[in-house]
Structure formats: structure tokens, C-alpha cells
Amino acid sequence: MLPLSKTIRTLLIGSGALLLVMMLYYPFGYDQAAFSIGGDMVLKNGAVPFRDFLDTKPPFIFYIYSVALFIFGHHDWSIRAFDILFHFAALFYFYKVLVSVLKDKDHALLSCFIYVILYTTSGYWMTAQAETFAIIPSVVIFYHTQRFLSGKGKPLGNALAIGLASTTLFFLKSTLMTVPVASLIFLLMRQRDKKTYTFAFASIAATLILSALYIYYLSSVGALVRLMEVFVWVQDYGGIAPLLSWDTITSVYIQRFPWHLVIIYSPTFLAGAAICLFFIWKSKRGNKTLTDVQYIYLHLGLQALLGLLAVMYERKCFPYHYSRAYWAMTPLIVAGLMHVISYVRTVIRPNYRKYVYALILIFTLPPLYRIGSQPIRWTFVELAGMSRAQVVEDTHEHYPLKEMQQLADKYSPMLTANDNVFFWGNHVGVYFYLDKLPTTITLTNTPLVTSWSPKNWRDTMMSQLRRSSPKLFITERRDFKGFINFTEMDSWENLQAWNSLRVYLDSNYTYSDSVGVYRVFMRKTAL
């Protein structure tokens, strides 16, 4: 590719860094609130995920949030500050790895810049997710596989690095294990000999041993049984949309998945990746020997393919699910677009080139538009002195961020340090803004309201609720999330349907007030 000027490089680095810093002003989303509360429990109470609280995500995301809160304190922007610093480090590492394997600094820089655009423009709800923090272990696996193939480093050291990274991915989210699987497939495609089989075995063994050590830890602290229960529960949770039903095929695989894919990446970026892989296929079909760089693109293409297949398997297709493949897609995008630009410069007449470039720009509009609608917008809201919570409710009427803060402003002065609070609902930022921690296993009530929820979870929650005797009992209305918990009732209706919880509330609490969707009950007497 043509070398970039020093000015262009400086602009790319500066604008990319600015986009990352703008995330500091992103509001507190639904998932970020739940992860922060779990992280706060880990930090302040030494809580163990699954044993002390339930969620649909594996445990490592809560440890990450606990680190963010430890460094920056109890603020809704703490995870944003941590995410920014994390990405500065992650992208620097990604850049160094790409330079090492591709031998092209400009290609590496453009790949990192496109990654920043894709990630920061996904918005406040879709950032700081489990997939977000998968970039470093994913790149570690990719890099150490390539190091082994090129004969660099000690095989055992490379295998241990892959094992540690794979374990991290598994406990961030099990479907992220497509990364080591893709590298293993590529490894065995590339060369098959005793040394390679030994390396593959060592990598798998390291993953199993390190995973077993963490599982042993969970067992030793009494969390393993519930971990297994959560694993079974999540299988049903993921099966809300059956894998091969006609409805899933038409609504998810044919409509939602490809539509979100195009909107997130843009037709231009997808075409760039496809063109890169097309030229590799063309070389293979012509029985030409692939270059080392083409093999690297093939490795990245396999990573992107399996990552996107995992998104289809999960069947939720939220934008953040696609972020697991950003790191693998961006070098392919750059390579493909360089092919296009080279073609335009050599084949298209100079008078028409500007029209071709304009067309390329038009087909890149989805992420470019979101630069204005996400990082720039939220920065403007903050600098203009506007209420982010009000803007959130104006644009996302079903996410009551402003009402969480209003509830906290009203009731925080009534609570002492020793007073407990119980929340029954989905939008658990209430806990965070009240600066209170759950005293039951319930963060969001999703794990307890599904038809397949284990009875012992409900029994445990009721026992903990009676023992902690919270001063406030807060429940939520109009938070129906059938696409998540497969129920047609909101949290208040679910409470009424659960006889034990309804009787407990009626017997021990009196209605105090409503703040938007939240109904607040005050304890009658000491229980």
C-alpha cells in the first residue's frame, strides 16, 4: 500500500484517541449498571459470582468492573475511564502485533483506526461489554499461534500464553472460545507434523488446567454447584429462540443478523474484507503458493467467520455481539480497500475517480454517521450542561435512567449506612445510585422469573430477604422484556404472581411513593 504521510498518521492517531476519550461521557447503560453492582459486591464484600449473586454472564466481567471501581471510585463514569485506558493499551498491543506479522506500520495504524470507529460508534449501551475486553486475549492467541508457525519463541511459552488467554475468554463468555478453535483449525491447516500436534496438545492442556484451577477455586468457596445450575439455565435462556426453527431462520439468520452486520460494519467495510479474502481464494484456485501475509489474512478471515457464526448461534444479534470480530475484520478491510484504491488509480480515468471515491464514502455512512450520533453527541450534551439522563429518556423511553437518579436523590437522605435495600426489577442502576449493595442473590430479576428457574434460587432469595430485613423494598413496572426472560409480565406483575414474595411485601411493608416506573415501599417495623 502507498505510505501515509506523517500528517495523515498524526491525524489518525489524534482523532482515534479523541473518539476514545469522548466515551467518558457515555451514560450508564442497562448492562453496565448490572456489571458495576456485581463488581462493587466483589470489591466491597469479597463476593463470589454465582455464589453471592446471579447473572447471565460468566464471572470475569465482574472482576474487570471491580478493578475499574477500585481505581476510579464509585462513579457511573468509572467503567468508561477504565475502558478508555484499556483500549489505549489494547490497541497499542494490537498495532505492535500487526506490525510484527504484516511488516506494514500504515496497515496496522489504519486497522486500529477503523477498530476505534466501529467500537466507539456502537454507543453507550454496547460498549464495556464482555466482548469488549476480549480483544487482548484474542490477539494473544492469534499472535502466539503465528509465532509458533514462524518458529519464534519457545513452543511451551507460546502454548502457555494461548492457554491463559483461552481461559480468560471462556470465563468472559463461553462463545468467545471460537478464537482458540479458529487458531487451532488454522494451525492444523497450515502444517501437520509431530511438533505441531505437540504444540496443539500443550495449548489445549494449558487451557484445561488453568480452567480447572479456577473451577476448583469456585468449588472451594461454595460456588461450583450454582455455577453448574447457571450453565444449565443459560442453555435454556439461549434457547428462547430455537436454533433451527423456521421462525429463527427467517427472523434471525435471514433478517436480523445480516441487517445488523451491514449497519454495524457498512457495505464498504464488508466489501473490503470480502475482496481481501476473494484474492486469497483466487490464488488458491490458481494453485499459486500463498505468501506469508496471505496466510495471515486467511487466519484472520477464519477468526472473523467463526466469531460471526457465534453471533448467529447466540441468536440475540445485539450490536455488541459483533464486536468480538472487530480485531479480525479490520486488517482484512484495510487490505481489501487498498486493492480497490489501487484498481481505481490504475484503471479508472482521473475524471471519474472522484465519483468512485464519493460512492465508497456513501456506502461507509453507517459508522461515519454514528460518530456524530454517539461520541460527538454525548460530548456535546455534557459540555452544553444538559442532563444526560434526560436525553437518554427522551431517546430511549424504556430505559428510566433519570428516574433511577431521582429515586436516589429522594431516598438516599433517609438511609443510614446500615440500612439495606431490596430491588425487584430489571434496571438495577437503582442500587448503584443509592450506593447500596444487594443482600440477596438477585441483581436483575431475570434469572428468577423464567419458567425454568431452579426453585432453590427463589428459596435462597426469600431466605436472604427475610434475614436482611431491608428498609426499602423497590419494585419496577413497565419493564417487560420478553425477548430476554420469555415472560409477558413486567416485574410488578411477576411479583404479584409469586405468592411468597407478594405475601412478604404485603405483610411487612407499606407503600411510600412512586418515582416514574418505580414503586417504593417502606418497612413497617423492625422485622
Where are these regions (language model features)?
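Transmembrane-helix signature of polytopic, membrane-embedded enzymes
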Residues: 6, 94-117, 135-136, 153, ...
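Extracytoplasmic
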Residues: 57, 174-176, 357-526
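Transmembrane-helix motifs of polytopic, lipid-linked glycan transferases
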Residues: 81-102, 140
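Membrane-interface transmembrane helices that cradle and orient dolichyl/undecaprenyl
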Residues: 100-105, 139-161, 188, 267-290, ...
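Short acidic/glycine- and proline-prone juxtamembrane loop motifs at membrane-interface regions
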Residues: 123-134
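Membrane-interface alpha helices of multi-pass inner-membrane proteins
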Residues: 156-174, 180-185, 205, 209, ...
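Hydrophobic/aromatic-rich transmembrane helices and adjacent perimembrane loops
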Residues: 178, 314-348
